[in-house]
From Swiss-Prot:
The gene is ruvC. Binds 2 Mg(2+) ion per subunit. Its main location: cytoplasm. Gene3D superfamilies: Ribonuclease H-like superfamily/Ribonuclease H (3.30.420.10). One of its GO terms (cellular component) is cytoplasm. This is Crossover junction endodeoxyribonuclease RuvC. It comes from Prochlorococcus marinus (strain MIT 9515). Mg(2+) 2 binds at residue 67.
């Protein structure tokens, strides 16, 4: 079974891909889809659509875990919600089951505290996936943490 974790955003979408073999977690890939801030918003959303489709076709995940978005009073709120909509549409078009997790739930599951720092989350991701390095950029580490949250929920520790 393969899972893709996704940390939504307009400028940067973090992703992390983990495979389960014989109840053991295996890190496959992580990174970000970056969009050009000088492009029009619709072009950036289309870039996310294309790049996520390419990732899905390459790695063929069975399930997905996506960070839930909560409304904040920010000028980027609408853009992030639109990017998340594109992400959900791509996953639905590929018939990939999606689970959603609040940031505090991810932190609690992975690092033991809903208020864990970014550093604590990254260290927990490294420990859980037996990595010798911190996934970069942070958005990719967040995406791996989101995927690990789903696996934990499924009883795969």
């Amino acid at each position: 079974m393969r899972i893709i974790g996704i940390d939504p955003g307009l400028g940067r979408v973090g992703y992390g891909i983990i495979e389960i073999q014989n109840e053991k977690k295996k890190f496959l890939d992580c990174g970000v889809i970056e969009t050009d801030k000088n492009k029009k918003e619709e072009d950036r959303l289309y870039e996310i659509f294309n790049d996520l489709n390419t990732l899905i076709n390459q790695w063929k995940p069975d399930i997905a875990a996506v960070e839930k978005f909560f409304f904040y009073k920010s000028s980027t709120t609408i853009s992030v919600v639109q990017a998340r909509g594109v992400i959900m549409m791509v996953l639905a078009s590929k018939n990939i089951q999606v689970s959603e997790y609040a940031p505090s739930q991810v932190k609690l599951t992975i690092a033991g505290s809903g208020k864990a720092s970014k550093k604590e989350v990254i260290e927990a991701v490294m420990f859980n996936l037996n990595l010798n390095y911190a996934p970069k950029p942070d958005d990719s580490a967040d995406a791996l943490a989101i995927a690990l949250t789903k696996l934990n929920e499924a009883g795969i520790n």
